[in-house]
From Swiss-Prot:
Annotated site location: Reactive bond: 69-70
A GO CC annotation given for this chain: extracellular region
Self-association state and partner proteins as the record states: Homodimer.
Cystines in this chain: 31-46, 67-97
Record's function text: Strong inhibitory activity toward subtilisin BPN' and, to a lesser extent, toward trypsin.
Annotated source species: Streptomyces ambofaciens
Official protein name in the record: Subtilisin inhibitor-like protein 7
Compartments where found: Secreted
Highest taxon above the source species: Bacteria
Length: 109
């Protein structure tokens, strides 16, 4: 294969940390050699991750979204391989709306 593997498992759960949150949903996202998986927007999520160099903290928030200030924390985890490198990521958002606005499509599942 000409492409290093990029295969990720993303989860979301209610809570402030992955250690205490029960995963509510889990999706798979494979970006090489082609976009596939159970993520609802594989092509755009892979394009967004490539644009950020695989850096989840560099994903651009969707500026047009207004969210309430309700505190109902959700935690997203990402584990797997991105372009041949092991990856483990965790991020807590104030609520589901803020999570969905945290990227164009990667966190929208």
């Amino acid at each position: 294969s000409l492409h290093a593997p990029s295969a990720l498992v993303l989860t979301v759960g209610h809570g402030e940390s992955a250690a205490t949150a029960v995963p509510l949903r889990a999706v798979t996202l494979t970006c090489a050699p082609t976009a596939s998986g159970t993520h609802p927007a594989t092509v755009s999520a892979c394009a967004e991750l490539r644009g950020a160099g695989g850096d989840f903290d560099a994903l651009a928030a969707d500026a047009g979204v207004m969210c309430t200030r309700e505190y109902a924390p959700v935690v997203v985890t990402v584990d797997g391989v991105w372009q041949g490198r092991r990856l483990s990521y965790e991020r807590t958002f104030a609520n589901e709306c803020v999570k969905n606005a945290g990227s164009s499509s990667v966190f929208t599942f």
